């Protein structure tokens, strides 16, 4: 029997076109549960449906509900913040140094992740099940965003280099087409001795891929006729999506995926490791509280067999029950 969702209704979520999409975010959060050491894995596995489905809720707040404070949490335009030694240490300092418009335009992603870690650690200390699950699932989304190179760049959609559309192509369309072939098994999570440093190391590593990503796409676009880069309508014009953006052809997506040489899969795996490790770090820093009494023993026992089966699948790089429109 598959694990049952405890005390939370299932979320029915439509496809989000930006920010890894459902395909990426759900896989990252679900695999991160499998990468947790025991006993933390047991607790998270009891709620794996919620952790998985809630992975895209920050995008729903951003796009469907238009929460005005949500957008800047998803990105950090590194080039516009000056030298690294001048970065504010936390969100409070950032708000003192920069005005609201600057932060809205350029993002607060790394500081928001650190702020979320403080809240998650507190929730673990208090053994507040609802807050643990909500914060952990949300945190997984932002860590996923922190592994998308263009979420760390001012040239976030190639708009500064005549490459518009590259953002959603890289993080949504490519996973849609190819994620079912990715092997997403990673080693167990580890504890970060310095959370602040771990966050900025993650951001810097991701940002180092932004220009190579753009260069690969630029070279390939230049060498490919327009009618092969984009899908064309009956009149021979570039087909536009409902968001009025050009629709890339599957053939171009395949070529770009090949040229990127595993970058998308690699970043997803890094995101899985980081998500599990930040969850684990918050739990350890909270004193490793015993969470076994937050769920009924009967539910944990019932889920034990499914956990073993899913663990065996995960060791092979597979995740149970993950589908998308191309499967």
In which residue ranges do the predicted regions lie?
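Positively charged n-region of N-terminal signal peptides that target proteins for export
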Residues: 1-5
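Bacterial N-terminal signal peptides
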Residues: 7-17
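N-terminal, motif-rich segments that launch catalysis or mediate targeting to/interaction with membranes
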Residues: 18-138, 149, 154-273, 277-327
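Functional cores that coordinate and move charged inorganic groups
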Residues: 140-144
């Amino acid at each position: 029997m598959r694990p049952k969702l405890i005390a939370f209704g299932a979320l029915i979520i439509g496809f989000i076109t930006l920010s890894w999409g459902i395909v990426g975010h759900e896989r990252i959060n679900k695999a991160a549960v499998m990468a947790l050491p025991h006993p933390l894995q047991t607790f998270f596995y009891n709620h794996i449906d919620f952790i998985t489905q809630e992975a895209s809720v920050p995008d729903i707040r951003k796009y469907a509900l238009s929460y005005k404070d949500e957008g800047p949490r998803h990105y950090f335009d590194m080039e516009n913040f000056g030298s690294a030694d001048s970065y504010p240490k936390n969100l409070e300092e950032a708000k003192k140094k920069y005005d609201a418009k600057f932060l809205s335009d350029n993002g607060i992603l790394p500081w928001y992740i650190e702020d979320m870690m403080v809240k998650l650690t507190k929730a673990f200390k208090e053994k507040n099940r609802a807050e643990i699950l909500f914060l952990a699932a949300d945190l997984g989304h932002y860590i996923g965003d922190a592994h998308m190179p263009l979420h760390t760049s001012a040239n976030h959609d190639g708009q500064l280099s005549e490459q518009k559309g590259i953002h959603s192509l890289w993080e949504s369309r490519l996973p849609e087409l190819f994620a079912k072939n990715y092997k997403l098994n990673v080693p167990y999570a580890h504890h970060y001795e310095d959370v602040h440093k771990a966050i900025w190391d993650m951001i810097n590593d991701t940002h180092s891929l932004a220009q190579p990503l753009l260069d690969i796409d630029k070279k390939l676009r230049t060498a490919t006729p327009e009618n092969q880069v984009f899908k064309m309508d009956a009149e021979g014009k570039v087909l536009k999506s409902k968001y009025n953006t050009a629709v890339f052809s599957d053939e171009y997506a395949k070529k770009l995926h090949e040229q990127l040489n595993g970058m998308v899969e690699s970043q997803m795996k890094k995101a899985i490791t980081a998500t599990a490790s930040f969850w684990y770090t918050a739990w350890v820093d909270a004193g490793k509280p015993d969470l076994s009494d937050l769920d009924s023993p009967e539910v944990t026992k019932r889920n034990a067999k499914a956990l073993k089966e899913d663990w065996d699948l995960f060791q092979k790089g597979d995740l149970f029950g993950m589908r998308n429109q191309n499967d």
